Regions:
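Glycine-rich phosphate/pyrophosphate-binding loop and the adjoining helix
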Residues: 104-169
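Short secondary-structure capping/turn micro-motifs that flank functional sites
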Residues: 3-4, 49, 114-115
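Electropositive phosphate-/nucleotide-binding environments in soluble metabolic enzymes
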Residues: 5, 23, 51, 88, ...
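Short, structured secondary-structure boundary patches
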Residues: 15-20, 54, 60-66, 120-133
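Short secondary-structure transition/capping segments
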Residues: 6-10, 53-54, 117-121
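Cysteine-cluster motifs in flexible loop/terminal segments that predominantly coordinate metals
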Residues: 2-33, 160-169
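Helix-loop-strand module that forms the ligand-binding subsite of alpha/beta enzymes
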Residues: 21-110
Length: 169
């Protein structure tokens, strides 16, 4: 939506309560994420990085939901849109959320990016549109494969809680 999302202040309240103390869409998303089979996170490129809104949102979503294991082994991908440059840096930024939370990253034919200043220009980016179509196909396939594995009784690897190196080393 268009509602403002404040950034994470690192207070740790979500570690104790399972919810962010801020009352906005983040807690609702984390609750819905529990039932989701997969995720695609997207952003326009702003100064060779993700928009402040998506960065604030994902910081808080993964700080709160990540601590609860909400995203573990749920397929995910990042997509970005730019007028010209900064896409790979932005993808790297978004992909870190996925990689740091045990989420299988869904592939496509190339980097998950499109180019254009407006929707019409993006639709004319034939390569980018093909990448998005293949990403959607691969996402659907991976989610079906995971569901079939669960139905067949194939055990998931054991999840290990994250070990944190003490700060005073």
């Amino acid at each position: 939506g268009n509602d403002p999302i404040a950034g994470c202040i690192g207070c740790g309240a979500c570690a104790a309560t399972g919810r962010c103390f801020r009352q906005d869409g983040v807690n609702d998303f984390v609750e819905r994420a529990r039932e989701a089979d997969g995720f695609i996170f997207g952003s326009p490129v702003h100064y060779a990085s993700a928009s402040g809104a998506i960065a604030s949102f994902l910081d808080r979503v993964f700080m709160c939901g990540g601590r609860q294991g909400v995203f573990v082994r749920k397929p995910a991908a990042s997509i970005v849109s730019a007028r010209r440059a900064g896409t790979t840096a932005t993808l790297d930024q978004l992909n870190r959320y996925i990689a740091f939370h045990h989420m299988p990253m869904v592939p496509s034919l190339y980097w998950n990016m499109v180019y254009g200043s407006n929707p019409d220009e993006v639709r004319r980016d034939e390569e980018g549109m093909q990448i998005m179509r293949m990403l959607g196909e691969n996402m659907a396939w991976m989610m079906r494969a995971f569901a079939l594995a669960r139905e067949a009784g194939i055990e998931e690897p054991q999840y290990e809680p994250k070990i944190k190196t003490p700060k005073n080393r």
